[in-house]
Amino acid sequence: MNGYPRFGWVDILRFQHQSLGEYHALLSLYNISLEEVRGEVGGREYHGFVYSATDGQGNKVGNPFKASKIDRSVGAEAIEKRFAYSAKKFKEDKKLSEITKHSVEAVLKQTYHKDKFIELLKAKGIDVVFRHTADGRIYGATFIDHRTQSVFNGSRLGKNLSANAMQEHFTLPYENEQPIPLTIPEEY
Protein backbone atom coordinates (compact mmCIF):
# COMPACT_ATOMS: atom_id res chain seq x y z
CA MET A 1 0.00 0.00 0.00
CA ASN A 2 2.31 2.74 -1.24
CA GLY A 3 4.78 2.19 1.62
CA TYR A 4 2.29 3.28 4.28
CA PRO A 5 1.77 1.36 7.48
CA ARG A 6 -1.30 -0.76 7.98
CA PHE A 7 -4.31 1.48 8.36
CA GLY A 8 -7.76 1.56 9.85
CA TRP A 9 -10.69 3.72 8.85
CA VAL A 10 -9.97 5.81 11.93
CA ASP A 11 -6.70 6.93 10.31
CA ILE A 12 -8.52 8.17 7.21
CA LEU A 13 -11.28 9.83 9.22
CA ARG A 14 -8.75 11.96 11.11
CA PHE A 15 -8.12 13.96 7.93
CA GLN A 16 -10.00 17.16 7.12
CA HIS A 17 -11.31 17.47 3.54
CA GLN A 18 -13.95 19.66 1.96
CA SER A 19 -14.99 17.83 -1.20
CA LEU A 20 -15.54 14.42 -2.68
CA GLY A 21 -12.51 14.97 -4.93
CA GLU A 22 -10.27 15.58 -1.92
CA TYR A 23 -11.70 12.49 -0.21
CA HIS A 24 -11.05 10.43 -3.37
CA ALA A 25 -7.41 11.58 -3.40
CA LEU A 26 -6.96 10.62 0.26
CA LEU A 27 -8.49 7.18 -0.29
CA SER A 28 -6.27 6.57 -3.32
CA LEU A 29 -3.19 6.68 -1.06
CA TYR A 30 -4.56 3.60 0.67
CA ASN A 31 -5.56 1.82 -2.58
CA ILE A 32 -9.26 2.44 -2.05
CA SER A 33 -11.72 3.87 -4.55
CA LEU A 34 -15.18 5.24 -3.96
CA GLU A 35 -18.32 5.42 -6.08
CA GLU A 36 -21.30 7.53 -5.22
CA VAL A 37 -24.57 5.71 -5.89
CA ARG A 38 -28.03 7.22 -6.17
CA GLY A 39 -31.27 5.67 -7.18
CA GLU A 40 -34.77 4.71 -6.29
CA VAL A 41 -36.14 1.41 -5.05
CA GLY A 42 -39.84 0.94 -4.44
CA GLY A 43 -40.48 4.68 -4.72
CA ARG A 44 -37.85 5.45 -2.08
CA GLU A 45 -34.70 7.40 -3.00
CA TYR A 46 -31.32 6.32 -1.75
CA HIS A 47 -27.87 7.86 -1.77
CA GLY A 48 -24.74 6.11 -0.61
CA PHE A 49 -21.13 5.13 -1.18
CA VAL A 50 -19.61 1.93 -2.46
CA TYR A 51 -15.92 1.32 -1.71
CA SER A 52 -13.51 -0.92 -3.65
CA ALA A 53 -9.96 -2.08 -3.13
CA THR A 54 -7.58 -1.08 -5.95
CA ASP A 55 -4.20 -2.15 -7.21
CA GLY A 56 -1.22 0.22 -7.53
CA GLN A 57 -2.60 1.67 -10.78
CA GLY A 58 -6.05 2.42 -9.36
CA ASN A 59 -7.79 -0.56 -11.02
CA LYS A 60 -10.49 -2.16 -8.89
CA VAL A 61 -9.75 -5.61 -7.52
CA GLY A 62 -12.21 -7.88 -5.77
CA ASN A 63 -15.82 -7.11 -5.02
CA PRO A 64 -17.02 -3.63 -4.02
CA PHE A 65 -18.70 -3.19 -0.66
CA LYS A 66 -21.30 -0.77 0.63
CA ALA A 67 -20.27 1.80 3.21
CA SER A 68 -22.92 0.42 5.55
CA LYS A 69 -20.93 -2.84 5.72
CA ILE A 70 -17.98 -0.90 7.17
CA ASP A 71 -19.40 1.72 9.51
CA ARG A 72 -21.83 4.64 9.50
CA SER A 73 -18.88 7.02 9.79
CA VAL A 74 -17.84 6.28 6.17
CA GLY A 75 -21.33 6.57 4.67
CA ALA A 76 -22.48 9.38 2.39
CA GLU A 77 -24.32 11.33 5.09
CA ALA A 78 -21.41 11.21 7.55
CA ILE A 79 -18.82 12.18 4.93
CA GLU A 80 -20.93 15.10 3.71
CA LYS A 81 -21.20 16.32 7.32
CA ARG A 82 -17.43 15.95 7.50
CA PHE A 83 -17.06 18.28 4.48
CA ALA A 84 -19.06 20.98 6.27
CA TYR A 85 -17.16 20.47 9.53
CA SER A 86 -13.81 20.67 7.72
CA ALA A 87 -14.81 23.81 5.80
CA LYS A 88 -15.72 25.47 9.10
CA LYS A 89 -12.48 24.33 10.73
CA PHE A 90 -10.34 25.61 7.82
CA LYS A 91 -12.17 28.94 7.89
CA GLU A 92 -11.56 29.31 11.63
CA ASP A 93 -7.93 28.17 11.52
CA LYS A 94 -6.19 29.56 8.43
CA LYS A 95 -2.86 28.20 9.70
CA LEU A 96 -3.79 24.69 8.53
CA SER A 97 -3.86 25.70 4.87
CA GLU A 98 -0.98 28.17 5.23
CA ILE A 99 1.37 25.49 6.60
CA THR A 100 0.68 23.25 3.62
CA LYS A 101 0.75 26.10 1.11
CA HIS A 102 4.14 27.41 2.27
CA SER A 103 5.66 23.92 2.28
CA VAL A 104 4.42 23.15 -1.24
CA GLU A 105 5.55 26.53 -2.59
CA ALA A 106 9.02 26.07 -1.07
CA VAL A 107 9.41 22.67 -2.73
CA LEU A 108 8.04 23.94 -6.05
CA LYS A 109 10.80 26.56 -6.14
CA GLN A 110 13.44 23.81 -5.86
CA THR A 111 12.64 21.82 -9.00
CA TYR A 112 10.92 21.67 -12.39
CA HIS A 113 10.80 17.85 -12.31
CA LYS A 114 7.47 16.37 -11.27
CA ASP A 115 9.02 13.19 -9.84
CA LYS A 116 11.55 15.18 -7.79
CA PHE A 117 8.73 17.47 -6.61
CA ILE A 118 6.73 14.45 -5.40
CA GLU A 119 9.82 13.03 -3.65
CA LEU A 120 10.69 16.30 -1.88
CA LEU A 121 7.10 16.81 -0.74
CA LYS A 122 6.91 13.27 0.62
CA ALA A 123 10.05 13.99 2.69
CA LYS A 124 8.14 16.91 4.25
CA GLY A 125 5.15 14.71 5.10
CA ILE A 126 2.98 15.78 2.16
CA ASP A 127 1.66 13.54 -0.59
CA VAL A 128 0.41 14.91 -3.89
CA VAL A 129 -2.11 13.14 -6.08
CA PHE A 130 -2.11 14.30 -9.70
CA ARG A 131 -4.97 13.45 -12.02
CA HIS A 132 -4.11 13.28 -15.72
CA THR A 133 -6.02 13.38 -19.00
CA ALA A 134 -5.58 10.54 -21.50
CA ASP A 135 -2.79 12.52 -23.19
CA GLY A 136 -0.91 13.01 -19.90
CA ARG A 137 -1.89 16.60 -19.08
CA ILE A 138 -2.41 17.41 -15.38
CA TYR A 139 -6.03 18.38 -14.73
CA GLY A 140 -6.07 17.97 -10.96
CA ALA A 141 -3.64 18.31 -8.05
CA THR A 142 -4.51 17.45 -4.47
CA PHE A 143 -2.14 17.80 -1.51
CA ILE A 144 -2.46 15.52 1.51
CA ASP A 145 -0.58 16.93 4.50
CA HIS A 146 0.06 14.19 7.06
CA ARG A 147 1.43 16.72 9.57
CA THR A 148 -1.80 18.71 9.81
CA GLN A 149 -4.03 15.83 8.65
CA SER A 150 -5.51 18.09 5.99
CA VAL A 151 -6.36 17.56 2.32
CA PHE A 152 -6.45 20.45 -0.17
CA ASN A 153 -7.08 20.75 -3.88
CA GLY A 154 -4.23 22.83 -5.24
CA SER A 155 -6.53 25.63 -6.40
CA ARG A 156 -7.86 25.94 -2.85
CA LEU A 157 -4.32 26.80 -1.70
CA GLY A 158 -3.79 29.38 -4.43
CA LYS A 159 -3.80 29.95 -8.16
CA ASN A 160 -0.07 29.19 -8.30
CA LEU A 161 -0.77 25.65 -7.00
CA SER A 162 -3.69 24.86 -9.31
CA ALA A 163 -3.54 22.00 -11.81
CA ASN A 164 -2.94 24.42 -14.70
CA ALA A 165 -0.08 26.10 -12.85
CA MET A 166 1.45 22.69 -12.06
CA GLN A 167 1.12 21.59 -15.70
CA GLU A 168 2.83 24.76 -16.84
CA HIS A 169 5.57 24.52 -14.22
CA PHE A 170 6.47 20.93 -15.11
CA THR A 171 6.41 21.46 -18.90
CA LEU A 172 8.31 24.70 -19.24
CA PRO A 173 11.10 24.77 -21.84
CA TYR A 174 13.70 24.95 -19.07
CA GLU A 175 12.36 21.97 -17.10
CA ASN A 176 15.75 20.23 -17.23
CA GLU A 177 17.57 23.18 -15.67
CA GLN A 178 18.10 24.02 -12.03
CA PRO A 179 15.88 26.86 -10.76
CA ILE A 180 17.64 30.19 -10.44
CA PRO A 181 17.75 31.22 -6.77
CA LEU A 182 15.90 34.41 -5.98
CA THR A 183 18.26 37.06 -4.66
CA ILE A 184 17.11 40.37 -3.31
CA PRO A 185 19.62 43.22 -3.11
CA GLU A 186 20.46 44.18 0.46
CA GLU A 187 19.34 47.79 0.08
CA TYR A 188 15.72 46.64 -0.04
List each language-model region with its residue ranges.
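Extended intrinsically disordered terminal tails
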Residues: 1-188
